[in-house]
């Protein structure tokens, strides 16, 4: 609710141009998608299809909403990469980030003993097969997985991918 409040306040103050459109029937937090601004949106199925978000919509219906409301031509769904301790149900911005020149930064794991190793390896395979809305493959840059961090014995979903990008 506070996320929406800041948007309404900024719009009311004239910071955003155009008409305010409210979509109260669809849950889409900021970190749940990445967009290149050229028609491609990245997301994870575990996040947008979580029971606490857009049920009872099917994945095809969610994709249709994203394409219509975000003017996207292609939605790239990743089925892997949810981190232990992640309370966002797998926001894309903790594991994969879009960068200029059709580049994706992504979290990799080299420790075969890490419980996240297999899932992050499967994510890497999906990334290698992914293309943008124009059918171009991505240039991939792998970020290391930081050493495990714990809070009261619970693993935290720490990565180097979850950062703020400011353009301009």
PLM ranges: what are they?
Residues 1-168:
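The feature marks the mature, well-folded catalytic cores of soluble enzymes
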């Amino acid at each position: 609710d506070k996320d929406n409040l800041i948007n309404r306040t900024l719009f009311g103050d004239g910071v955003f141009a155009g008409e305010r459109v409210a979509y109260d029937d669809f849950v889409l937090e900021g970190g749940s998608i990445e967009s290149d601004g050229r028609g491609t949106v990245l997301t994870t199925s575990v996040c947008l299809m979580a029971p606490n978000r857009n049920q009872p919509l099917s994945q095809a219906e969610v994709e249709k909403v994203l394409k219509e409301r975000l003017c996207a031509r292609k939605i790239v769904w990743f089925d892997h990469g949810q981190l232990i301790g992640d309370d966002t149900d797998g926001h894309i911005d903790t594991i994969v980030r879009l960068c200029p020149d059709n580049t994706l930064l992504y979290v990799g794991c080299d420790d075969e003993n890490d419980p996240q190793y297999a899932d992050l390896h499967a994510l890497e395979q999906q990334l290698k097969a992914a293309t943008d809305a124009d059918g171009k493959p991505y240039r991939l840059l792998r970020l290391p997985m930081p050493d495990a961090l714990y809070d009261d014995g619970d693993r935290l979903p720490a990565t180097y991918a979850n950062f703020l990008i400011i353009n301009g």
